[in-house]
Regions:
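A short, hydrophobic C-terminal helix/tail in secreted or cell-surface proteins
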Residues: 348-353
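Extended, highly charged segments
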Residues: 1-347
């Protein structure tokens, strides 16, 4: 499996899933929760004619929010799943909120649509800092995926009983569709580094995978333009990147999404068929579920293979060591007849009176 696979869900992918959920499952009744893995929770919601399962993972290697098929019943006895299951019993999910390019998702629950909000589930999808929070109507933390002590963070302490506060404010620029090419170029040219990091360090919502997508869809002279220092990139190539940059912003803002794959193991939710010559007849949420299901299983297999290889290597070394010990003992024992004769002679010598 190549580096960067499975692809980390960026804000564009998150936004595409939330757009689907907002359109298709609100309002809906909470039904149950289970925790199949330490860093993953699965939630079930029931509508008038359908049942929807969601999976949220705060695993640092692959944080994600997905609509999934009905899973096996695993992890119903975990403390977190019990707290959520009992706390949200008979409640309805009435809103899903996520602001602009922020990676914080808020699920709001009430006894019925129109009532005051009684509980919240907050999902923070921020790489190794990802987390889940279960809050009351005063934003007091009832349960949390992973606790953060004051010694671990200078910004906020995360523990049950404390009041929830969001992550630090993102001070980078917000991408704007009406920004001019010159303004965009001036903004990313302040520090002369690779185009990839110029974009990541300047604008909100830019991930390494987005820079790769812009590179793939842009007709530039250099096929690896994102790794090139911005001072050495021609104006024509920058304008080509900027053209697709504005397309991305437009589709992000207008929730215009479609799933496609590129470079074998990577995906995009804002490319269209005419841009990459790709036909996909499966809907976006199903495609995302299939992608992560396949690649996460492959990753587990690879980790298991490496574990088995380590065990075999260790056992082989032990066997070689034991073989050497036995061989040494055998070599020494080849003269045992001589030693036996000498000792016999000594034992049979007549003793002096």
């Amino acid at each position: 499996m190549q580096k960067g696979v499975p692809q980390i869900m960026d804000i564009t992918s998150i936004r595409s899933v939330l757009h689907y959920l907002t359109k298709n499952i609100l309002p809906t009744k909470f039904e149950t929760a289970q925790q199949p893995e330490p860093n993953t929770i699965q939630l079930c919601f029931r509508g008038v004619n359908s049942q929807t399962w969601l999976e949220f993972s705060w695993n640092g290697d692959s944080p994600r929010i997905l609509k999934i098929n009905k899973p096996e019943k695993i992890g119903r006895e975990s403390t977190l799943s019990k707290q959520i299951r009992y706390g949200l019993k008979y409640m309805a999910l009435i809103s899903i909120d996520q602001d602009d390019f922020e990676r914080v998702i808020k699920f709001s629950f009430a006894k019925k649509p129109g009532d005051e909000i009684d509980k919240y589930l907050i999902f923070e999808l921020m790489g190794k800092h990802s987390n889940i929070f279960y809050l009351d109507n005063k934003l007091k933390i009832i349960a949390v995926g992973k606790q953060i002590k004051s010694s671990q963070s200078s910004f906020r302490t995360i523990s049950t009983g404390s009041i929830y506060s969001g992550p630090p404010v993102n001070l980078k620029k917000q991408p704007r569709e009406d920004e001019s090419f010159q303004s965009w170029k001036d903004s990313i040219s302040i520090v002369p580094e690779s185009l990839k990091y110029c974009l990541i360090n300047t604008y909100q919502g830019v991930s390494p995978i987005l820079t790769k997508q812009l590179e793939v869809v842009s007709a530039t002279v250099n096929s690896e333009i994102m790794e090139k220092n911005i001072d050495f990139i021609s104006n024509s190539d920058l304008k080509e990147i900027f053209k697709n940059w504005k397309i991305w912003i437009n589709r992000f803002k207008n929730n215009n999404f479609k799933f496609s794959t590129f470079n074998n193991d990577f995906y995009c939710v804002w490319f269209f068929d005419k841009e990459i010559n790709y036909e996909n007849k499966i809907d976006l949420c199903t495609s995302l579920e299939n992608y992560y299901d396949y690649h996460l299983k492959q990753k587990k297999i690879e980790l298991l293979e490496k574990k088995i290889e380590r065990i075999i290597f260790k056992q082989t070394n032990n066997e070689k060591k034991n073989l050497n010990i036995q061989y040494d003992l055998l070599t020494k024992s080849e003269k045992h007849e001589v030693y036996k004769a000498v000792s016999y002679t000594h034992l049979t010598l007549p003793t002096k009176a």
